[in-house]
């Protein structure tokens, strides 16, 4: 018996893990936006959830967060870690999965990286290279 041709999965994981990650992202963002976690740090910060990455077996969710303004990142991560069990239970109620995934919280570094690249592109050395050269006419 020959094996069936396997479909190639999209970059970043299988379609199912991407879909589950997006459902969890929406659930966490909704919980935080509605003030579902009673914590002074989380209540005093607007926290965005730009991405959730799932392990292939869907048992681990790495949740990338960013406090608006980029301040108190460590405090926000610590508060989320402290309320991890509550959030896991809420996610289990909102997302229909066989197992509620273990949660890990990380700061989303993409905003800082984009700002660094933007600053680099605006630097005088790069601007000089981008100016049209008048002696090539």
From Swiss-Prot:
This is Ribosome-binding factor A. GO terms for molecular function: ribosomal small subunit binding. The gene is rbfA. The lineage of its organism: Bacteria, Pseudomonadati, Pseudomonadota, Alphaproteobacteria, Hyphomicrobiales. InterPro entries: KH_dom-like_a/b, RbfA, RbfA_dom_sf, Ribosome-bd_factorA_CS. Belongs to the RbfA family. GO terms for biological process: maturation of SSU-rRNA. NCBIfam families: PRK00521.2-5 (NF001802), rbfA (TIGR00082). It is found in: Cytoplasm. Monomer. Binds 30S ribosomal subunits, but not 50S ribosomal subunits or 70S ribosomes.
């Amino acid at each position: 018996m020959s094996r069936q041709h396997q479909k190639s999965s999209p970059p970043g994981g299988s379609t199912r893990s991407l879909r589950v990650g997006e459902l969890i992202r929406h659930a966490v963002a909704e919980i935080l936006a509605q003030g579902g976690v009673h914590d002074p740090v989380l209540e005093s910060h607007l926290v965005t959830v730009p991405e959730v990455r799932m392990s292939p077996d869907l048992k681990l969710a790495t949740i990338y967060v960013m406090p608006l303004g980029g301040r108190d990142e460590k405090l926000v991560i610590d508060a989320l870690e402290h309320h991890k069990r509550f959030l896991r239970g809420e996610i289990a109620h909102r997302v229909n999965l066989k197992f509620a995934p273990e949660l890990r919280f990380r700061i989303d570094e993409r905003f800082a990286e984009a700002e660094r690249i933007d600053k680099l592109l605006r630097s005088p050395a790069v601007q000089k290279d981008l100016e049209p050269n008048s002696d090539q006419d």
